[in-house]
Swiss-Prot record:
The lineage of its organism: Bacteria, Pseudomonadati, Campylobacterota, Epsilonproteobacteria, Campylobacterales. Keywords: ATP-binding, Ligase, Nucleotide-binding, Protein biosynthesis. It comes from Helicobacter hepaticus (strain ATCC 51449 / 3B1). Allows the formation of correctly charged Asn-tRNA(Asn) or Gln-tRNA(Gln) through the transamidation of misacylated Asp-tRNA(Asn) or Glu-tRNA(Gln) in organisms which lack either or both of asparaginyl-tRNA or glutaminyl-tRNA synthetases. The reaction takes place in the presence of glutamine and ATP through an activated phospho-Asp-tRNA(Asn) or phospho-Glu-tRNA(Gln). The gene is gatB. Belongs to the GatB/GatE family. GatB subfamily. This is Aspartyl/glutamyl-tRNA(Asn/Gln) amidotransferase subunit B.
Length: 474
């Protein structure tokens, strides 16, 4: 057990999925040719005035509602002054003293324990552009400049990389379930800065924190935190903490698995915040507040409903609500008539178990209606579970219709009791000696009889075979 305690706070930048940018009317589409979606406001040209996007404010209110945070009806935008090539105005429009979203909290589960992580604030700001470094040149793409961001700042309440990842995954699911962001980490819609420090256990003092910048995958976030903790502990134990652990911003080298120094960490005073004179103070009227606080069912609420109403186990309910796509697929199966238990098994075990590489629920070729039909045919006794797996393999490889495949593959079960009884009587008659042994106490022979009936019937319903065979054997 380590003699040190890890202190972690996270700042997450969520790109809001508005159709236009936060302070102008340019499109926010990803992947367009460089500098296509720009205007005088994006470019920071003299005389261009920002106009606040109402939809961005509404989405911020929705997030605050989801985490039970204070919503500040009055807030102010401020200029955050710094120079960087992808920031054409030489300042970023952000919020400082009065953010739209105040204190809230997010509950996580980690290592079979529940913990509440405080959220200090969430404020709106504009994104910067993007620097592209090629050979001896650096290029600037300002398509992303002025895109709306919601920066969510946690309290330093996390004590391990596992807790940090649990918090991030929960936050990721919240913004996805709210529908305020696609939270695509590969495209930069969900980016994280981690603030990491250590201290001897039992010490209440907060020591030097190091910021690790722009992490965009759960895997790399965890590795970056773990490396940084090890680096700081090693420096402490070697007596080099004061010289090697300084307040700075570091980058994570994904190839080497280490963090390296990028620049000294600025304090708020270094940014010289002041209210933006081009933007009026924000007042959230009753109509906008009413729209913002109206949110869909959140992951925790959905999980409780699955447990209490559908009778699912907590673990299974947690798996289904860990992803918006999974939850929607599952509920669509229920709407098509599949049972909760059948939908759960065939979605999470059979279908997901067959997804490999880049194949996803959206690209696997089996939609929720098709899988629900397969589940219903099994539950109706028309086919066996084994046959269902064969059909699912074909569906994923070639597609098709469940009922047509049942017929063409000859997988329909025999459910006619008369036909099954005839086969049972034939098997028992041909094995009279074994029937006598069974009746004298050799119960294991029951499996032999079942096997013979299944073999001779070529597709009898196993459940009915068991029931009718027991009746015949007495």
């Amino acid at each position: 057990m380590s003699a040190y305690e890890t202190i972690i706070g996270l700042e997450v930048h969520v790109q809001l999925n508005t159709k236009t940018k936060i302070f102008c009317f340019c499109a926010t589409s990803f992947g367009d040719e460089p500098n296509k979606n720009v205007c005088p406001t994006c470019l920071g040209l003299p005389g261009a005035l920002p106009v606040l996007n109402r939809e961005a404010v509404k989405k911020a209110i929705s997030f605050g509602t989801a985490i039970n945070a204070t919503i500040n009806q009055n807030s102010v935008f401020a200029r955050k002054n710094y120079f960087y090539p992808d920031l054409p105005k030489a300042y970023q429009i952000s919020q400082f003293e009065i953010p739209i979203v105040g204190r809230g909290s997010i509950e996580i589960e980690c290592n079979n324990q529940t913990k509440t992580i405080g959220v200090t604030r969430a404020h709106l700001e504009e994104d910067a552009g993007k620097n592209i470094h090629e050979n001896n040149y650096s290029k600037v793409d300002l398509n992303r400049a002025c895109t709306p961001l919601l920066e969510i700042v946690s309290e330093p309440d996390m004590r391990s990389s596992d807790e940090a990842i649990a918090y991030l995954k929960k936050l990721h699911s919240i913004v996805r379930f709210l529908g305020i962001s696609d939270a695509n980490m590969q495209e930069g819609s969900f980016r994280c800065d981690a603030n990491v420090s250590i201290r001897p256990k039992g010490d209440c003092k907060l020591y030097t924190r190091v910021e690790i910048k722009n992490l965009n995958s759960f895997k790399f976030i965890q590795k970056a935190i773990e490396y940084e903790v090890e680096r700081q502990i090693e420096a402490w134990e070697e007596g080099k903490y004061q010289s090697e652990v300084v307040q700075e911003t570091r980058l994570f080298d994904t190839a080497k698995g280490i963090t390296r120094s990028m620049r000294g960490k600025e304090e708020a005073a270094d940014y010289r915040y002041f209210p933006d004179p081009d933007l009026l103070p924000v007042f959230i009227d009753e109509n906008l507040m009413r729209e913002g606080v109206k949110i869909p069912e959140m992951p925790d609420e959905k999980r409780e409903r699955y447990i209490n109403t559908l009778g699912l186990k907590p673990y299974d309910a947690g798996v289904l609500t860990s992803s918006l796509e999974l939850a929607l697929y599952f509920e669509s199966m229920l709407e098509e008539g599949a049972s909760a238990k059948g939908a759960l098994t065939w979605l999470t075990t059979e279908l997901l178990g067959r997804l490999k590489g880049e194949n996803t629920l959206q690209t696997c070729g089996v939609d929720s209606k098709t899988l629900a039909t397969l589940v219903k045919r099994i539950e109706e006794g028309k086919i066996s579970g084994k046959s269902g797996k064969e059909i699912l393999d074909v569906l994923m490889e070639k597609g098709g219709d469940v009922d047509s495949l049942i017929d063409s593959m000859g997988l329909a079960q025999i459910n006619d009791d008369g036909a099954i009884i005839a086969v049972i009587e034939s098997v028992l008659s041909a094995n009279a000696d074994k029937v006598a042994e069974y009746k004298s106490g050799k119960d294991k022979l029951f499996g032999f009889f079942v096997g013979q009936v299944m073999k001779n019937s070529k597709g009898a319903n196993p459940a009915r075979v068991n029931e009718l065979l027991k009746e015949k054997l007495g």
